[in-house]
């Protein structure tokens, strides 16, 4: 194998030094082989050094600044350079250390060289400097001929691009091999790039395994670069991952915006009806809403929490809906305000969480001394007051009590006691620390029953615009429902009114939120549910969606009856989807008319016939051929033998067909009753048997006919 660099060097020597004798050329080429070997080793080592510097991995190969094991003959150079006493590797590494000529010093060298005016406006990269190429030339040439600066610059640029290409190919090849770089892989890259596989040729530490007369091949060594391709990428997501928009405000407009907010809130809440309507319309369409939305929401939270008035709450809800409908308020960054607003709105719907009292059911007399009850007041006790020294000194007492009360936990006992009692095992902590929940400090009193619908409308509108507010409202409602149903036997009218408020709030939040109420359905007895609760549950039929909801449908239909029909939109949606699918997939109607074989000729007029043959009667048109002339092999059927045509069948679509006689495989005896019954004809008597065969006709069009049972009235869950 011969290197392209070697051939180019020989061509340059031949072209620029034509006066040199062949003898000196041969002697120089013999010593230049080892020097080219060193040059290729330098290129490979330098390329691997750049690869390690760029990728941050382990260097593929690096040589010390002062090599001590160079198996090459150093050729003395002409004293045209200050580094004439160094060989190839000494010069390259020494210049690289000085930062002016080497591979690593290409950035600074580009500015210091004569080519800095051309490279000054370009981005600097690590590469060869023209003076480095000049050093290479001086070490491989024994004459005083010097290369021009333009030739050195062009060679430096080409060599840098070649090294960059090799490094990039090594990285790509190693990525496909799991991040492992080997000599074999790099040699494969060099082979594909038309460069001799010389990596590691000057490293005498390795065992040489082959020598083809020009190059040495060494045993393979593995270097790990998997850390480069298997890095852990840390993506820092902010706390508020929602898509948000911020409307910046200049300082000189702050006073005007404050006055705008104050005037808008005053007019919408405390003015007459005409001014309230004008303020709401202004809030709906003002382009400044993106800048003042957070301030308005904060004021509404304060008014709803501290002004416990129903008419004022109605006006606040109305203003909130108008501001939320404004397009500039969408996706506004106001999570802290929504956090407090959700607590206030849910408190107005279902009362504050602390006001929900779980009923205290007295246990049986035999259980009073052995079962630890979770009273409502225990939630307010400090953790240091929960220590029981007797329990700490004798931890086996609770274990014995647990064993004594185990039979009470079976399904045969009352489920109510199973819910409100908790046995403390010895594995549990004696003073468990409950997880601190981040809850809002705002609260409000529940509004009247007549305002629940408008409140649910407000919650649904705000939640549909903000996913964060939707999640907060759903969490707060679920938290209150869990506490309400904890050990409670729902039987009073007040309890069902509370459930009605919760259901209406969940329906306002959507299908996903309402399905959180389904587990609590099993805790309600259908016979005890009053008639006033069923109308509030009827709108939930909107969320019915197929066979999976059949039990929920039956439960709702049992109590709601015909009131459920207006909300069964699943039927209409399914029918609309079916009709749309048929319309989209409908084909253009095409009629099939089957061809009838026969001989047909157009009727010519007398004038046309006269113009065709003229006065020559031999050219006159011949008469139409008959059917027998057109089809000489045609045999007309004998209608006398077709006795089946005389039998009239009364079955639609059926016609009589003669059954062909079958040859009897078993000969019948002459006195056989079957042969006598069939007229003595044996198997030939079966020709009198007729069967009815229906002739199926294909439709005339390709338009599919749908059965009428697939209409709207026939759809069912």
From Swiss-Prot:
Disrupted gene: phenotype observed: Larval lethal during 2nd instar stage. RNAi-mediated knockdown in female germ line cells results in arrested oogenesis at stage 6-7.
CDD domains per record: HFD_TAF6L
Family: Belongs to the TAF6 family.
Subcellular location, principal: nucleus
Subunit structure: Component of the Spt-Ada-Gcn5 acetyltransferase (SAGA) complex consisting of wda/Taf5L, Saf6, Taf9, Taf10b, Taf12, Ada1, Spt3, Spt7, Spt20, Sf3b3, Sf3b5, Nipped-A/Tra1, a histone acetyltransferase (HAT) module made up of Gcn5, Ada2b (Isoform B), Ada3 and Sgf29, and a deubiquitinase (DUB) module made up of not/nonstop, Sgf11 and e(y)2 tethered to SAGA by Atxn7; not essential for SAGA complex assembly, histone-modifying activity or chromosomal recruitment. Interacts (via N-terminal histone-fold domain) with Taf9 (via N-terminal histone-fold domain); the interaction is probably direct.
Location(s) in or outside the cell: Nucleus; Chromosome
GO biological processes: positive regulation of transcription by RNA polymerase II; RNA polymerase II preinitiation complex assembly
Organism of this sequence: Drosophila melanogaster (Fruit fly)
Protein name, as recorded: SAGA factor-like TAF6
Keywords tagged on the record: Chromosome, Nucleus, Transcription, Transcription regulation
Function: Component of the transcription regulatory complex SAGA, a multiprotein complex that activates transcription by remodeling chromatin and mediating histone acetylation and deubiquitination. The SAGA complex predominantly acetylates histone H3. Involved in SAGA complex coactivator function but not essential for SAGA complex assembly, histone-modifying activity or chromosomal recruitment. Required for oogenesis; involved in transcriptional activation.
A single cellular component GO annotation: transcription factor TFIID complex
Domain of life: Eukaryota
Region called Sufficient for interaction with Taf9, residue ranges: 123-204
PANTHER family: TRANSCRIPTION INITIATION FACTOR TFIID SUBUNIT 6
GO molecular function, one term: RNA polymerase II general transcription initiation factor activity
Spans through the membrane: none
Stored InterPro entries: TAF6
């Amino acid at each position: 194998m011969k290197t392209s660099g070697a051939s180019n060097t020989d061509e340059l020597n031949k072209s620029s030094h034509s006066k040199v004798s062949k003898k000196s050329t041969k002697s120089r080429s013999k010593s230049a082989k080892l020097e080219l070997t060193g040059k290729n080793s330098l290129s490979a080592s330098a390329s691997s050094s750049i690869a390690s510097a760029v990728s941050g991995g382990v260097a593929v190969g690096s040589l010390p600044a002062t090599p001590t094991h160079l198996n090459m003959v150093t050729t003395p150079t002409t004293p045209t350079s200050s580094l004439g006493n160094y060989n190839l590797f000494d010069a390259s590494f020494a210049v690289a250390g000085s930062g002016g000529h080497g591979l690593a010093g290409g950035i600074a060298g580009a500015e210091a060289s004569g080519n800095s005016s051309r490279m000054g406006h370009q981005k600097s990269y690590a590469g060869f400097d023209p003076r480095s190429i000049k050093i290479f030339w001086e070490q491989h040439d024994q004459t005083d001929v010097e290369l021009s600066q333009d030739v050195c610059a062009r060679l430096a640029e080409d060599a840098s691009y070649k090294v960059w290409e090799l490094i990039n190919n090594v990285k790509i090849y190693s990525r496909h091999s799991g991040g492992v770089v080997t000599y074999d892989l790099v040699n494969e890259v060099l082979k594909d790039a038309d460069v001799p596989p010389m990596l590691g040729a000057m490293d005498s530490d390795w065992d040489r395994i082959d020598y083809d007369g020009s190059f040495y091949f060494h045993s393979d060594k593995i270097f790990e670069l998997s850390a480069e391709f298997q890095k852990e990428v840390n993506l820092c997501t902010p706390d508020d991952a929602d898509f948000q928009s911020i409307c910046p405000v200049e300082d000189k407009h702050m006073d005007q915006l404050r006055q705008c907010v104050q005037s808008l809130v005053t007019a919408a809440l405390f003015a007459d009806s005409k001014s309230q309507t004008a303020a709401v319309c202004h809030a709906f369409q003002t382009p400044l809403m993106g800048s003042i939305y957070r301030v308005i929401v904060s004021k509404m939270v304060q008014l709803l929490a501290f002004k416990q008035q129903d008419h004022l709450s109605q006006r606040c809800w109305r203003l909130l809906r108008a501001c939320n409908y404004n397009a500039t308020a969408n996706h506004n960054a106001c999570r802290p305000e929504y956090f407090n607003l959700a607590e206030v709105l849910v408190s107005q719907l279902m009362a504050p969480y602390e006001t929900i009292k779980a009923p205290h059911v007295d246990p049986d007399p035999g259980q009073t001394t052995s079962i630890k009850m979770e009273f409502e007041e225990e939630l307010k006790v400090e953790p240091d007051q929960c220590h029981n020294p007797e329990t700490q000194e004798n931890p086996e007492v609770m274990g014995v009590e647990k064993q004594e009360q185990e039979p009470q936990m079976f399904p045969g006992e009352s489920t109510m006691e199973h819910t409100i009692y908790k046995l403390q095992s010895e594995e549990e902590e004696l003073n468990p620390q409950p997880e601190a929940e981040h809850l809002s400090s705002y609260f409000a009193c529940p509004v009247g029953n007549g305002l629940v619908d408008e409140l649910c409308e407000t919650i649904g509108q705000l939640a549909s615009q903000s996913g964060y507010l939707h999640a907060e409202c759903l969490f707060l409602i679920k938290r209150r429902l869990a506490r309400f149903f904890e050990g409670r036997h729902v039987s009073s009218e007040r309890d069902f009114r509370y459930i009605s408020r919760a259901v209406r709030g969940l329906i306002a939040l959507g299908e996903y939120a309402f399905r959180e109420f389904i587990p609590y359905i099993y805790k309600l007895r259908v016979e005890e549910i009053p008639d006033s609760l069923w109308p509030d549950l009827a709108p939930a039929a909107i969320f019915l969606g197929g066979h999976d909801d059949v039990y929920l449908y039956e439960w709702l239909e049992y109590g709601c009856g015909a009131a459920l029909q207006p909300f069964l939109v699943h039927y209409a949606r399914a029918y609309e989807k079916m009709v749309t699918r048929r319309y989209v997939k409908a084909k253009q109607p095409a009629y099939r008319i089957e061809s009838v074989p026969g001989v047909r000729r157009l009727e010519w007029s007398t004038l046309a016939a006269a113009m065709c043959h003229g006065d020559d009667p031999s050219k006159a048109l011949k008469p139409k051929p008959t059917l027998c002339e057109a089809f000489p092999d045609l045999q007309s059927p004998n209608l006398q033998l077709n006795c089946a045509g005389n039998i009239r069948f009364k079955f639609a679509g059926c016609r009589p067909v003669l059954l062909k006689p079958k040859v009897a495989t078993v000969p019948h005896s002459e006195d056989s009753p079957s042969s006598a019954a069939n007229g003595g004809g044996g198997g030939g008597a079966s020709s009198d048997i007729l069967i009815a065969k229906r002739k199926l006709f294909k439709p005339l069009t390709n338009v599919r006919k749908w059965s009428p049972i697939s209409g709207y009235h026939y759809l069912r869950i």
